[in-house]
Amino acid sequence: MNLLKKYWIDVVVVVLFAAISFAYFVPADIDGRILYQHDASAGRGLGHELQTYYEQTGEHTRWSNSAFSGMPTYQTAPSYKSTDVLSKIMQVYHLGLPDNVWYVFAYLLGFYILLRAFNFRKELAALGSIIWAFSSYFFIIIAAGHIWKVWALAYLPPMIAGVVLAYRGKYLWGLLVTALFTAFEVKANHVQMTYYYLFVVFFMVIAYLVEAIKQKKFAHFAKATGVCLAGAALGILINSSNLYHTWEYGKESMRGKSELVKKNSANQTNSGLERDYITQWSYGIGETWTLLIPNAKGGASVPLASNETAMKKADPQFMQVYEQLGQYWGNQPGTSGPVYVGAFVLMLFILGLFIVKTPMKWALLAATILSILLSWGRNFMPLTDFFIDYVPMYAKFRTVASILVIAEFTIPLLAVMALKTLIEEKEALKQNMKYVYISFGLTAGVALLFAIAPSLFFSSFISDAEMQALKNIPAEYLSPLMANLTQMREAMFSADCYRTVFIIVIGTALLVLYRYNKLKANVMVVIIAALCLVDMWMVNKRYLNDAMFVERSVRDNEPEMSNTDKIILQDKSLDYRVLNLASNTFNENETSYFHKSIGGYHPAKLRRYQEMIEHYIAPEMQKTMQAIMTAGGDMSKVDGRSIYPILNMLNTKYFILPLQGNQTAPVLNPYTYGNAWFVDKVTYVNNANEEIDKVGKIDLRHEAVADKQFETALKVSNAQGNVSQVELVSYAPNKLKYNVSSEKGGVVVFSEIYYPGWTATIDGQKAELGRVNYILRALNVEKGKHTIELAFDPQSVHTTETIATVSFAVLLILIALIAFLEYKKRKNSNVTK
């Protein structure tokens, strides 16, 4: 009863959060419709082979052959038994709410836990949760299907709450909350978001250090820091399997350093992606105004013709052109929407810079500025280059614009701190109303100037990419077209500027009414919460709305099998690959749902495979398409041996070709090398550059090239005139069995992707695999008849699973200990009373 009396407001807030989360998705959640997300749909194709294997065996495979000719599942479908119980705890935390609904609920609840850890009043904590959770980017990524990113962002505030509790002297609670939500966070499996928020933690810890120095509480600071590190370590260890294998895979993936030394060395980084790739999605400097005005650059890359405000200004003679243009005119390649933190929220943030007096203010300001500067990427290369070259792990991640998630955290946090100061120090408000008016001028005032004279402050409303696309239009049409297009976009921009002014005027009026005792604090907080919710809700509905929801059957039904798929699947051979030339081969996973694909989509594919795509596979695809079309599909007229040897060594048995009317046709490749073959000769080279160059200069059916590090394993292959046979007799994604016979023995090349962790046995005896032709497995086999088994069951998985299980047991003991101590504390308190 006492517990209910103490926490009933918290319970009401949690129920309110659930109601708000449900309400956002009305009527879709009532109708039973679900969100169709591109990335989630793509993931289904990538995971179909894994799901089928699990249904058949009850086991998870760590390898899949469905995309990119084969890759580990560490990043496509990480699943470990050690975190099964943790997953159930996470479901309890989400209250078992449906997908999409619980995403928003977790946003809200996580920030509420953080603000309560800061000891905010409950109504202020609820307000802060709303203005954080409804930041536009958090809804845009739900629409896009970036679900792991959603999870990671939802668990970061409560993880930081553990840090706050520790530095407030609540060591046991700090340890538990840090450990639990670090475990949640790491399991969310989006290292980039976690990494970015470590900058926030860094600045916050500096703020606590400054406080400790001022108050001479060094022992407390050291103890709290130790508690945080211990909690984080425990949460990390609970996810040992996931973290270790993510790290291991990272070295082999596009996130790792290439072994190739390229001519354009300035574009390379010391340990990660290339600079151009890292900064491809960089926020524009002028685009930063979207924090205040969502349509500062037009919003999302959706058809311009769908914007009513713009079309009111459209000249009918240019309608055909406008149907081809998007609303967005920034310099990113494209965007699903802007980063908008709320107009009045931003004003409160600026007000907080004046009236909040704690070191934490400076920590939040520093983190905000850093995130904005880094989000500019290629538009501010001095700082970007410094971080790429000298800050550990920064070069591992692309899409630098997403670092604005830091600002989306720090801005609402300082905004609600400002409100807390206004409420707790009302006399200070009366004496410093000038800061309210200054903040008003820096936000609403600026937005009003933009609205009145947009062209005075922004030089162009047409992107560089659009200028390139329009340059072929005759000059007599181009000039009036550009003038009209500018008018249309100025209208869009001005409308949102006025909207921003309106929101801030209402919010400022509430502060003034509170200043003159016309509103009570609680009432003001509730109205501000409603104002910010309505503001951000309306903006978010532009990018995540009911029109995006479909009947559940549309998403959950198995993709429709085409006639081409049916024909190919009649081939009951155990293992072969398919190259879909009728699709965007390396940007789709639909092919992977039914076939073992040469292509696929994943942002962290194996680096060596990506380099083979760039050097050989992509050029061969173009030549192959042209040759087959020229031959009218008659493969006897296609010189497949010389046109596409790399595709042959990858066991590409079928090509899917495009036909008119969105139809396709399968073409059997008679030149494929099959599952495995003996080679006459292996040439050893000194480095990756020599190896990848040599691949294109030898007869891959009879020769192989390998790095000299594998010479001990592969030895010499002198199999000329060798009568040999290699037959695949058993297939599973993670286990392949071959019968081999040969007169002389030698090196067998398998049409399978090499990756550390694959093991080999010959007649039950361990054998050492080597890597040949830059990406394939190979094995030296003696003459005679043998049985070869290749298996992928890394010992590292078993080791890390043991560590994770023990660590989770420690967490459960910690939970039990705190529960016991709290019970004992309450019991003693009742006895005293």
Task: Describe the role of every protein-language-model region.
Residues 9-46, 231-245, 370-373, 446-451, ...:
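Transmembrane signal-anchor helices characteristic of membrane glycosylation enzymes that use polyprenol
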Residues 347, 653, 662, 698-833:
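Active-site-proximal, structured, solvent-exposed surfaces of multi-pass membrane proteins
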Residues 102-119, 345-347, 414, 508:
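Transmembrane-helix motifs of polytopic, lipid-linked glycan transferases
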Residues 18-114, 130-153, 267-341, 374-384, ...:
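Membrane-interface coil-to-helix junctions
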Residues 223-283:
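Polar, glycine-rich mid-to-C-terminal structural blocks
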